[in-house]
């Protein structure tokens, strides 16, 4: 009798993998189009679209073209966008960030008028709005915290006035969530939510995004306010503080390299958890696919599903359109 004849295997996991139908029936996690948010870059001008050179397939849009893009996104079933603006001018005081006729404020009004059902989230940070490329105001090479928070309050309120459904502070200044919540409530915008970039790491995966937004730091790096990639418990502290201060949704950023942080956040806190599939992660897939080294569609869908499996309720991704088409 051969060795194989002697096997007495009661539990054979492969039974449940034998056919596609069986695999689908026992699948534990499912990605849907409702999970996706599309980051949208808006620039000055009219009737123009520019491809971001370091992010093939990702574009900057003038407001009129952004409106058309949002109509297409909503038709695909995508429920939300996150708006990022490229201002016509940058100032040291960041005042363009809260200009009622600024790039983001105009975009919010136009998109909300054209696609009122779409959830509009807006980035709240100063890096595109000052010449320094940092998320806060700068004095003598130092990124100021409390002074920055005052500007962020004005920025968030201006977005709410324009029609934003959620503001998304990505700046990582201490105390900004509580301050923004207070400012929104005091200006009769208690229905406007806050999606906090709660655990945002000082990552090397952000390079192409800064290219897209023309917002690379002009000196130093962001390690004095963004988190050390080596730290886990610090992330839990940041998340807890933001929840206590009034965050409705918390985010972990970047994505794939920080799935352990997503899982810990979801296990520890009873709030919706978002994840950002960031520009560097997107660009790496694009580059490898262009070389023919990987199947882009399969890697895209696997990456997004893994984020869902780790505990993400919401996934910000530049692949939202492509994924939505696959999921239809």
UniProtKB/Swiss-Prot annotation:
It holds the Pfam family ALAD. Its EC number is 4.2.1.24. Stimulated by magnesium, inhibited by zinc. One of its GO terms (molecular function) is zinc ion binding. 5-aminolevulinate 2 binds at residues 279, 318. 5-aminolevulinate 1 binds at residues 210, 222. SUPFAM superfamilies: Aldolase. GO terms for biological process: protoporphyrinogen IX biosynthetic process. The keyword Cell membrane does not apply. GO terms for cellular component: cytosol. Keywords: Heme biosynthesis, Lyase, Magnesium, Metal-binding, Porphyrin biosynthesis. Pathway: Porphyrin-containing compound metabolism; protoporphyrin-IX biosynthesis; coproporphyrinogen-III from 5-aminolevulinate: step 1/4. It is an enzyme of class 4 (lyase). Disulfide bonds: none annotated. The active site is at residues 200, 253. It catalyses: 2 5-aminolevulinate = porphobilinogen + 2 H2O + H(+). Mg(2+) binds at residue 238. Belongs to the ALAD family. Catalyzes an early step in the biosynthesis of tetrapyrroles. Binds two molecules of 5-aminolevulinate per subunit, each at a distinct site, and catalyzes their condensation to form porphobilinogen. Does not seem to have a metal requirement for activity. Homooctamer. This is Delta-aminolevulinic acid dehydratase. It comes from Chlorobaculum parvum (strain DSM 263 / NCIMB 8327). The lineage of its organism: Bacteria, Pseudomonadati, Chlorobiota, Chlorobiia, Chlorobiales. The gene is hemB.
């Amino acid at each position: 009798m051969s060795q194989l004849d002697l096997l007495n295997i009661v539990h054979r996991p492969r039974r449940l993998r034998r056919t596609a139908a069986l695999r689908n029936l026992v699948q534990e996690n499912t990605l849907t189009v409702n999970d996706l948010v599309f980051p949208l870059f808006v620039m000055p001008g009219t009737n123009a679209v520019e491809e971001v050179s370091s992010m093939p397939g990702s574009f900057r849009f003038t407001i009129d073209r952004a409106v058309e893009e949002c109509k297409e996104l909503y038709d695909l079933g995508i429920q939300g966008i996150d708006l990022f603006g490229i201002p016509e001018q940058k100032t040291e005081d960041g005042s363009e960030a809260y200009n009622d006729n600024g790039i983001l404020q105009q975009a919010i009004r136009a998109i909300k008028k054209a696609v009122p059902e779409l959830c509009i989230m807006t980035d709240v940070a100063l890096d595109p709005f000052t010449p320094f490329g940092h998320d806060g105001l700068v004095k003598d090479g130092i990124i100021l915290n409390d002074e920055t928070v005052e500007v962020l309050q004005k920025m968030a309120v201006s977005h709410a006035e324009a029609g934003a459904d959620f503001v998304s502070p990505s700046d990582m200044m201490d105390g900004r969530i509580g301050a923004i919540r207070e400012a929104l409530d005091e200006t009769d915008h208690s229905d406007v939510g806050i999606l906090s970039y709660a655990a945002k790491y000082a990552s090397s995966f952000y390079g192409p995004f800064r290219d897209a937004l023309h917002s690379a730091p002009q000196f130093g790096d962001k390690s004095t306010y963004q988190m050390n990639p080596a730290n886990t418990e610090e992330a839990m502290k940041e998340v807890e503080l933001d929840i206590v201060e009034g965050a409705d949704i918390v985010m972990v950023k970047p994505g794939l390299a920080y799935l352990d942080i997503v899982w810990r956040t979801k296990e520890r806190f009873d709030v919706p958890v978002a994840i950002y599939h960031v520009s560097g992660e997107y660009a790496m897939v694009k580059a490898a696919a262009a070389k023919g080294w990987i199947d882009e569609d399969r890697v895209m869908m696997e990456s997004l599903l893994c984020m869902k499996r780790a505990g993400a309720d919401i996934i910000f991704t530049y692949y939202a359109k492509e994924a939505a088409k696959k999921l239809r």
